[in-house]
Amino acid sequence: MEYHCVLFTVLLQLIIQPGRSRPTITPEGPRLTVPLYSNFSLHCQSNSTVRWQHENRPMRTLKEEQRQGQQTILKVNRAGPQHLGKYSCREEKTGEKSSIYVYVKDPENPFRRTIVFDIVAAEGDTTVIPCLATDPDMKNLNLQKCDGQPLPNSLRYSASLETGVSVEKVRKEFEGCYVCVGTLDAATVKSGRYQLTVRLVPDAPPPITLGQPQRVLLTQGEKLSLSCSTSNVNSDIAVKWKAPNGVNPSVHQNSHLLTEPITHVRTAILSLSSVTMQDAGNYSCEAINEKGTTAKPVWVNIYEKGFINITSVDNSTRRVRAGESLSLRVVMNAYPKPHTFSWSYSGVKLTNTTDHVITSRTHGNSYTSELKLVRLKVSESGIYTFSCLNRDATIRQTFEVHVISKPQIVSYEGPIDGQVRCVAEGYPTPQIKWYYCDLPHSRCSNLLNATQEEEDVVTVTMTNPPFGKGAVESRLNITKNNYATLECVASANGEIVYTLFSISENTVPHELFTPLLIGFVAAAVILVLILIVLTYKYMQKPKYQIQWKVIEGIHGNNYVYIDPTQLPYDHQWEFPRDKLRFGKTLGSGAFGKVVEATAYGMSKADTVMTVAVKMLKPSAHATEKEALMSELKVLSYLGNHINIVNLLGACTVGGPTLVITEYCCFGDLLNFLRRRRVYFYYTTLGEDAYYRNVMMQSEPNDSRNGYMTMKPSVLGILSSENRRSLNKGDSYSDSDAVSEILQEDGLTLDTEDLLSFSYQVAKGMDFLASKNCIHRDLAARNILLTQGRVAKICDFGLARDITTDSNYVVKGNARLPVKWMSPESIFECVYTFESDVWSYGILLWEIFSLGSSPYPGMPVDSKFYKMIKEGYRMESPEFSPSEMYDIMHSCWDADPVKRPSFSKIVEKIEQQISDSTKHIYLNFSSRLPAAPGPREESSSHVHRLNSVGSHSTATQPLLSSNDVFLDRSSPSHPVV
């Protein structure tokens, strides 16, 4: 049948409407029916090149003609069963396509003829029975069993004339013969028979069974044979061996089938005819199925010759009471298998009897031999020897067995010539003591008023053999005393025997010294105990140590620290004590405190400056005093930097040591972040604030880790530029400074502030590293903020009581900030520049979590240490840009060498902060003189920022190079 008129009309419509994006197929409609062996044509109209597809496959066997213009014509001559199906016209550029389904009507075959009647489906999959109708008028297409039996209850399917019957979630019980049934012209028609076979699918990777232990021992020249088997519910399984590099074994495989249940078994056998030392290593058997891969290792050890190594042995010296039993055991590793196990006693080989029971056990290359000695006699004391031999080695292990016997008094006599004599024997050799009392025929040692005779006693050891009983003789001279009864007591190993001697005259011994001696000893013991307790309490007190360490030299991984006590101290730092007026305490520890103070004439006679003074408490000891002096020397050695708490002066003569440093009005960074949480505005890099963090609440246990809160919070909501700018006016007074501090503390906090804090701390740490100084306790609690939100690194040292600070955990005999420490510092006590970089990464996490505790919800216990060893790292905090988290993660590299230096970190953060922040920081830095020198005073253009600067040249070396001024004539810039 030809369709030229229809096609011509459609072509005219396409020419009139050329803007359509999808190709158009004519004849129109979803399907086309053509008689068997007739010709038909399909026209595709498109603005670009198209390709015809049949059943979603490219057309290769059918004629395809490309004509001029926008039309592609597909011509099919003598349409047969193979031409039935869906035809698609697909644009090559856009992938857009249109489709039409062609029925090739065959009166004799209502279903398309096919040669595929065996269908294999995986269990759980959806499979299609391809019974495609040749006539679109077929009705009621359904699926039936070939034998007329009902379908399985759980079988669910969908039927379509164009796609066939789709069976969902195939199960093993669906296996069988099926036929498609439909109605055509009121008659029932059936398709051919389809045999459905369901292939079982495993639910897990395959199991592996090794034919030998996982540790195989061989000597050079022997044959290696390793066997590995696996099984699977279907035949889609493979097993193979992996050998160490350079080893080329032969591998033989075989398989067999088990029927109930059906199981496919595969075995791989690896062989080496003659092994060498290079063949040793880790061999791995791998089994693979549809669910994955399973592997089991086999360690092959090659030795030049055989060996026997004892791995466990009972105590070689054994003591047992007579009549008890004793077991002697030896555990050893050996290869090849020992051919001789033997036990001997005093050189005589023992046989397996009821008195000497010998047992042996074998597990792989481990062998155990045990000798049980039943109801030992004293005469069986002596040396027992275990011997083991194999082809190449011999070992011997000896045991000394001592049989404990009760002491016995074997003879006694007297009194004769003013002496009594007592002889005892046993093992161990007994001890003899003499007691006397005034009661006749009584055991003196049981009486409360019994007296032990220690004078005029002569004791001689008669025999003391290495094994068996020893004998001892004791003689007592009684010429000087008169007794009613004498008692000879022999004791050994908790056993006691005695004999009594009756004396004719009775003289009660003098007991004057006994109570005095007891009282003296008791008093001495009490005094010693008190001294021990006091010493222990003193040793347990926390010792103040300066955390900052200055390195003298680096030799590989070994750092040589400078003894800070050996550093020089320049007395130009001295400041008169009477010019300090102390205020409130800013921080306090076990041995010291930091106090706010006012310094008069620090840089000029009429200047007044707010400073922080670190001092010791009266309870401090000499070690703490020396440590504070060391801290003073280290600060003077380091020099000044805008991002560390700089030294302003000191008082070391005429009283206790005072260290005068800059006063930071906003306290520590940790509590500053926690106070500002409710005013935090989250911003993306380079943008103004757009999100206010109103959901976060202050943590109930905010610790005062350093300075107490200086000023009340004042709510301020300004733009990111105005919020950072300082007030500028014609004059500047102390009330102006207080007002400015109150306003700035109340201002909002945004992401640019957090980046600024991170940048400043990195700059400060880079400075310390350039001075070969290691911090060892870098954390937000040890960062102080001053006016302009300038961050300064400090070491609280004695100003913090670490015994009450939960951030410091007892480890050994010290309290350490474990959650801030690198793995090498925790497990190896190694502190380096790289360990400071790790702590800096934790500090970044604190900053971008707005003061949260690191590793939230994780106590410092054995599980915590295990997770750190296994590489656990914290996830990105809530307000951290991805670039900053990348820096954190690089700081936490397990390999210290791969961690970035502080100079690299500074470069990375500089890429994130805004140009205005960089300009502010450079402005501050450029106004920080590099060396002491005179400075002209200009009251109209400069003003003081607390103790960060002064109005004129100071006599103190560091103070003169530590002044920071803001030029009132310069444009207003945000303060970092």
Swiss-Prot record:
The knockout note for this entry states: Defects in the number and distribution of melanocytes.
User: Which residues does the annotation flag as glycosylated?
Assistant: N39, N47, N282, N309, N315, N352, N449, N477
Q: What class of enzyme is it?
A: transferase
Which keywords, in A-to-Z order, does the entry hold?
ATP-binding, Cell membrane, Differentiation, Disulfide bond, Glycoprotein, Immunoglobulin domain, Kinase, Magnesium, Membrane, Metal-binding, Nucleotide-binding, Phosphoprotein, Receptor, Repeat, Signal, Transferase, Transmembrane, Transmembrane helix, Tyrosine-protein kinase, Ubl conjugation
Provide the GO MF annotations for this entry: ATP binding; cytokine binding; growth factor binding; metal ion binding; transmembrane receptor protein tyrosine kinase activity
Q: How does it sit in the membrane?
A: Single-pass type I membrane protein
List the InterPro entries: Ig-like_dom, Ig-like_dom_sf, Ig-like_fold, Ig_sub, Ig_sub2, Kinase-like_dom_sf, Prot_kinase_dom, Protein_kinase_ATP_BS
Location in the cell reads: Cell membrane
Residue stretches spanning the membrane = 516-536
- Where is it predominantly found? membrane
Checking Gene3D superfamilies in the record gives:
Immunoglobulins, Phosphorylase Kinase, domain 1, Transferase(Phosphotransferase) domain 1
> Per its record, how is this protein called by name?
Mast/stem cell growth factor receptor kita
Q: Which organism is it from?
A: Danio rerio (Zebrafish)
Q: What is the lineage of its organism?
A: Eukaryota, Metazoa, Chordata, Craniata, Vertebrata
